[in-house]
Amino acid sequence: MAEVRDRNLPHQVQVHPQYRLDNTTGGGYGAKNYHSGPSTSQVLAVLTLLPIGGTLLALAGLTLAGTVIGLMLATPLFIIFSPVLVPAAIAIAMAVTGFLSSGAFGLTGLSSLSYVLNRLRYATGTEQLDLDHAKRRVQDMTEYVGQKTKEVGQKIENKAHEGQVGRT
C-alpha cells in the first residue's frame, strides 16, 4: 500500500488528445472540412494565375515547335556540310585551347618567378639589410645636420663677437 507521504507529492498528468479518423469533424490532426468550399482569396488566386500559366505554357509549346522545325530544316545542311564543319570546329576549339593554355602557362611562370625571387630576397636578407642601411643613413644625416647647425651658430656668434670688439 502507498504510504501517507507519497500521497502529498504532486503528480504530473500527461494528456494525449485522440483524434477521429473519419475526417467528418472540423477539428483534429489531418481532419478536413468538407462542408465549406474554397475561400474567396483562393478563387481569386486561381482566376488570376490560370491565364498567366496558360500563356506561359503556350509560349513553351511554341518554342518547342520552333526548335523542332529548325532542327528539321538544319539537319540536312549539317549532314551535307559535316565533312567541313566538324574539322573546322575541332580546329577552332584547338586554337582557343592553345591560346588559353599559353596564357595560363605564362601567368604560372610569372607567379613562380616572383615567388622564387621573393624567397631568395628573404633568404639572403637583402630586404633587412636595405632597411638597416636606410636607418643608418637617416641617423647619419641627422647627425650631420646637427653638426652643421652648431657650426653655423658658432660662426654667427664669432662674427657678432668680432663686430662688438671692433666697435669698442
Curated annotation (Swiss-Prot):
Where in the cell is the protein located? Lipid droplet; Membrane
Instruction: Provide the membrane topology annotation.
Output: Multi-pass membrane protein
Q: Where is this region: Polar?
A: 2-45
Q: Which gene encodes it?
A: MATP6-A
**Keywords, sorted A to Z:** Acetylation, Lipid droplet, Membrane, Transmembrane, Transmembrane helix
Q: Where are the transmembrane segments?
A: 43-63, 76-96, 97-117
Give the domain of life. Eukaryota
Name of the molecule in the record: Oleosin 18.2 kDa
Q: Which family does it belong to?
A: Belongs to the oleosin family.
- Taken from the record, one Pfam family name reads Oleosin
A GO CC term attached to the entry = monolayer-surrounded lipid storage body
Per the UniProt entry, the disulfide pairs are none
Read off the InterPro entries from this record.
Answer: Oleosin
Q: Per the record, which residues fall in region Hydrophobic?
A: 46-117
Q: Which GO terms describe its biological process?
A: lipid storage; response to freezing; seed oilbody biogenesis
Functional summary from the UniProt entry: May have a structural role to stabilize the lipid body during desiccation of the seed by preventing coalescence of the oil. Probably interacts with both lipid and phospholipid moieties of lipid bodies. May also provide recognition signals for specific lipase anchorage in lipolysis during seedling growth.
PANTHER family in the cross-refs: OLEOSIN, OLEOSIN 18.2 KDA
Please give the residue positions where the record annotates the modification N-acetylalanine: A2
